[in-house]
Amino acid sequence: MAAKEVKFGNDARVKMLAGVNILANAVKVTLGPKGRNVVLDKSFGSPVITKDGVSVAREIELEDKFENMGAQMVKEVASKANDAAGDGTTTATVLAQSIVVEGLKAVAAGMNPMDLKRGIDKAVIAAVAELKKLSQECSDTKAIAQVGTISANSDESIGEIIATAMEKVGKEGVITVEEGQALENELEVVEGMQFDRGYLSPYFINKPETGSIELDSPFILLVDKKISNIRELLPILEGLAKTGKPLLIVAEDVEGEALATLVVNNMRGIVKVAAVKAPGFGDRRKAMLQDVAILTGGTVIAEEIGLELEKATLEDLGTAKRVVITKDNTTIIDGSGEHTQITSRVAQIKQQMEDSSSDYDKEKLQERMAKLAGGVAVIKVGAATEVEMKEKKARVEDALHATRAAVEEGVVPGGGVALVRVASMIADIEVLNEDQKHGVVIALRAMEAPLRQIATNAGQEASVVANTVKNGTGNYGYNAGNDTYGDMLEMGILDPTKVTRSALQFAASIAGLMITTEAMIAEIPQESAPDMGGMGGMGGMGGMM
């Protein structure tokens, strides 16, 4: 085991603070509408330009092991805020730095670190409760667009496209962000349920100009097995021929004689039919077939629950207004399932999401829920160059997370105003001793730090701006975008409550641990041994006599 170096007390804290400051100073220049860019060097390709706090934090690794520990702990603050709310990473970093700097000053002055931490924790608990009271519901499209705009660094086009997407697919709907081909941002909305399985045979195509299949008011047969014997399908096909309606078959697979017969019947116009494979694999396929059944008001024909395909009737089939099938996708539009059943299925999937610990499973469950609840929207980000594309895509993703957080827990006045107002409300919090009282003061001071940093980045004197805002009431704050004071909600400067709350909680949690650090242990860097020199050439052998 390599030898370790141990630092104690003030020596340890000074090193840790140096690391905290290096990381926080690099991150905090990005805060606010007039925040600056940070350029990140990449080992291949062009450098990345970003205004995203967590992207900057993730790049930082320091040479000094003790300084690096401080930097990594603040990086954890940014990552946690990003995971919880998807935004607020820079705010969290600024809060953490302020608490650590003031806290370590107090420790150096001889105060008890544990009492300081207790004071900070009490202040944060009280602040979170007040934030929730201050919070307002965010339900209308205008408010959603404003939140998205603020999070995307005052880019109105991003805020509006996200608001439109949410309006189209609902609040539970899936909105994904992709790199587009054009210069402008584009929004593509897929209504109804879409899954990534296309037609099993091109001979089913009835719209040659688009290479797709369109079925109007079709019956939908859902089967959880392979169909290879046409005899199993005959009763259903005979019943269908009488109604004259088209049929979509969704099964594990349709092959051999069964597929050939369906193709021939379709081409002769006897029965209008199309077949696709069921989406997903294993248990997920069973669940997705059940989703389609609930959406279309049908029944999944599965032998494990005692239903045989030969005995299926038209009552077992689902229906929809329209089905569109391409080479890669199947979209079921306006299924005729009962609304109450769809709602309870969505609630069931939501519960599974809460119980799941796997991010992959959660993502798949979220997709299933969205497909049932309303649809899927794809925002295609447009830009002139690859560097701009990466930067813009990161901003769109940030804005999307922020708007989701706003819909979930509501909004508070932006621009750091909410934390300043909350700080004034909890100044008289009860504590047990003077050191705890100072802990509360440290937390209250930190709550001003985001506003001060926004003002500094806008080229203003932070203390003047902070005092002006503190002397105001309610939503009165500083709009750094156009350098004016006024009602933040009226000016459309909103922050999601969840983002502000998460930033404060994670910053206080990790900063509190850093204040109470008394020793640090790190490996002593090994000096790498010099390379061995090449071996000299061997002399030739002398000639033999």
Curated annotation (Swiss-Prot):
Similarity field: Belongs to the chaperonin (HSP60) family.
Compartments it resides in: Cytoplasm
One Gene Ontology biological process: protein refolding
Protein name: Chaperonin GroEL
PANTHER family: 60 KDA HEAT SHOCK PROTEIN, MITOCHONDRIAL
Record note on quaternary structure: Forms a cylinder of 14 subunits composed of two heptameric rings stacked back-to-back. Interacts with the co-chaperonin GroES.
SUPFAM superfamilies reported in the protein's UniProt record: GroEL apical domain-like (SSF52029), GroEL equatorial domain-like (SSF48592), GroEL-intermediate domain like (SSF54849)
GO molecular function, one term: isomerase activity
Origin species: Shewanella denitrificans (strain OS217 / ATCC BAA-1090 / DSM 15013)
